[in-house]
């Protein structure tokens, strides 16, 4: 019955999303030429392409994936997800499938804005001011957040938030529909009991506190960059889009000018290799992993590594170095089944989807409790008094974020394969979760380290452009990241002991994990071991083609000409928040750089 309910829900979703393609498709021919070629139709690539095309330029946007399918969670691990495997380091992700951390990344129009959890957080002004890069201070970048922001419910924010927002931008943003899940308010009340202030706007004067965040949602539907930029009638009239077209390298002339790209197009008849040319510039927006791979395949990267693969070196640059990512330990809190959102009603998802189709409302227009989040500085938490304190400016700089999800009572029963595909967890962990979920709903509250110290690398596994690169995220290699997670788990232990949580028998699930000490004998040892087993990526990797080392201040690749990078790989450090906002701002920013150069 559980599997039947799941299949019916997916059938309803499939019927809705098998509608006519609303995005134009360009049929490519070998040798086609455009003014600008942009590789990757994701968070940054779609805005950049749309802005340049609307300015009157001949723009080709190529995307390795295809059209946009349905619901966010079902897409993780699907064909619309690159689902990059990684090289294990034996100290993280030990209870993931094959002990490999998996990096999800959208492989479709809109990229990761099509499969993420839709949270709109810009980060902290210090994230940009501390870079020390000319033209990339907070005051330089915030106009680009405002340019695309079209906040539809400004009246729900305090008047102090008005200067921080725009209501007329191209990306319509708003609050999620109330899910009906009582934990939505209970999480907030529990954190308030620990003196976390309620913050009505994490993009306003302060990030600190617990909040219901603004999301990339409009009229009950996801607002990806594909929907916000590419689906506009004025954009469709002027922008060329090539789907299912994977870039395999940049073409250079003898003077190191980027003059085009090599691609592989995919269709029912098989793969076809083409060469496409740009009169003016090539812009790589393939994401932190994809952009690094394309650069190295094209001879831009660490010389020793490229020489080892017999790739001619065009520019010896630290491509693929300094990778950082938001990482967390997955923490599960079983709660009394009477507090479950649907209390075992297996067919409620089908009814919810029907209600959504009719009215764009109801629980299916919500993202459950995912829009409830908290940011704080763990060094400003008094563990003896069990309260967050606010006694210095440093307390305004968060180092941790709590994110939430909810597994309803019996929701994952009989769905082992589906859960493993979407989560990447080992079957042993999934089966333990199923046992807990048989009798209780499960609140998932996980602490994200916002500025991790651990650094990883990306290298080519081979010179074959259709093979995944060798990704070594190296999570938890710096012990300071583990210590921050241990602090956050102690705060979670305090949280489940608040009256709001105790009323529903909430407790942190202590999973059986091989090699971990018994909790009753060694609490800290158990949680340290747990962290290394239950490591999970937020899919926010940055830094593989960073500003100041690989790129100049206008996102131009050093050592070559007519080639730029516009995606999260450009950021030397992670923003303190979800990264989609920064990616879109970078796309807007590179369009300005290019238009300014074209005008001069």
Which residues does each predicted region cover?
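N-terminal redox-cofactor-binding region of secreted/periplasmic oxidoreductases
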Residues: 2-600
